[in-house]
């Protein structure tokens, strides 16, 4: 890094090369260049609008910045480490293009409010992209659910067979998680969509700027009311990382279930070749790499959230260099969430097949209909807790005899309690067990069909 920095006039000696490298952020904040250019164009227009610079100078600056955008997109502008950061890289190139007029761009602006603006512009776009991905993920879940309203799957608590449910009902649980994620990102967007531009280094500026004008140009909903808060706030980034972490929680939970379902012990799903990998030594293997990677990458996003919280917890007002550390974790979290949503959507849509025959067998090979026996007695006047205790003893006796409840004879049922009649067999059949749970939000087929239709409307279909 041999060139003098913009701020170097106050210093008598050059920055140590290793420190210059340590201090530089251009290697990662180049991600913000398009947003930096857009924000700078709005700032230049405002300077001209308020008479701080001439209209002709404003036009020169805007045109020069647009030329840099084209150069960057064509691969002709690739700033090196000597630029320190994306802001200086742009300003230097702008001055090369338009001459000394380029040096007027930074009038009434600091890198502190500039980077805050860039990051918010970036995150606005990314939130909208992730929301679009969430909608596609939801559509795929609904497509599968719609075809499997009456497909049964064991439901679990404590990873022990509990009660059978509709496969569609199970998938709709993930739809609802994704819906909360979608709504949560909308809430975050509102607090991202606030302009700090014009807050200056920390105290505002002596120039007669118009912050509302730049906010309007950049389509910000409002502006920061306090300049100290505007340049030091990273709540919006933390909120996004919280929302991103919850998206990853939900994807990771689904991933864990798919990993289990694909195992020989469960055999509920088949992983198609397009979304699985093999072993370098064991030729029989088909590995669930996609859900395993999603599960693993979840920790990265959690880590970035924790890092951001730790960065912020002890910072005095206003800007501190610590805040340079907000970007890499933010960028990586955005990229991780987007990649995982894409991979999981493809996996569900193209790489997964439910083994419906195996699922049908699975729901008949356990005691997950025991609650329905208790409900059967309770519906016939036996207090539920008494019925519960009776059925608990029945299950214990059946296990000892190597029988399932469906294998008991009517005589055996009536020896247990005289209220049992021959309709007990229908009451404890898996399909009836599921169909009977027709309370709002339950797994009954009628309720699930309504839920699928309501979900379609929720996402605008």
From Swiss-Prot:
GO MF term list: argininosuccinate lyase activity
Residue intervals passing through the bilayer: none
Classification via PROSITE patterns: FUMARATE_LYASES
Pfam family, one: Lyase_1
GO cellular component, one term: cytosol
Keyword Lyase listed: yes
Any GO BP: L-arginine biosynthetic process
Subcellular location: Cytoplasm
Sorted UniProt keywords: Amino-acid biosynthesis, Arginine biosynthesis, Cytoplasm, Lyase
Thermal properties: Optimum temperature is 42 degrees Celsius. Shows more than 35% enzymatic activity in terms of relative activity at 25-50 degrees Celsius. Inactive above 55 degrees Celsius.
Matching InterPro entries: Arg_succ_lyase_C, Argininosuccinate_lyase, Fumarase/histidase_N, Fumarate_lyase_CS, Fumarate_lyase_fam, Fumarate_lyase_N, L-Aspartase-like
Pathways involved: Amino-acid biosynthesis; L-arginine biosynthesis; L-arginine from L-ornithine and carbamoyl phosphate: step 3/3
Functional pH dependence: Optimum pH is 8.0. Shows more than 35% enzymatic activity in terms of relative activity at pH 7.0-9.5.
Record-listed E.C. numbers: 4.3.2.1
Enzyme class: lyase
UniProt activity-regulation remark: Strongly inhibited by L-arginine. Inhibitory effects are lowered at pH 7.0 compared to those at pH 8.0. At 42 degrees Celsius and pH 8.0, activity decreases to 77% and 25% in the presence of 1 mM and 10 mM arginine, respectively. The other amino and organic acids do not affect activity.
Family label: Belongs to the lyase 1 family. Argininosuccinate lyase subfamily.
Function: Catalyzes the last step of arginine biosynthesis, the conversion of argininosuccinate into L-arginine and fumarate.
Name the UniProt record assigns to this protein: Argininosuccinate lyase
Native species: Nostoc sp. (strain PCC 7120 / SAG 25.82 / UTEX 2576)
Lineage, top ranks: Bacteria, Bacillati, Cyanobacteriota, Cyanophyceae, Nostocales
Gene name for this UniProt entry: argH
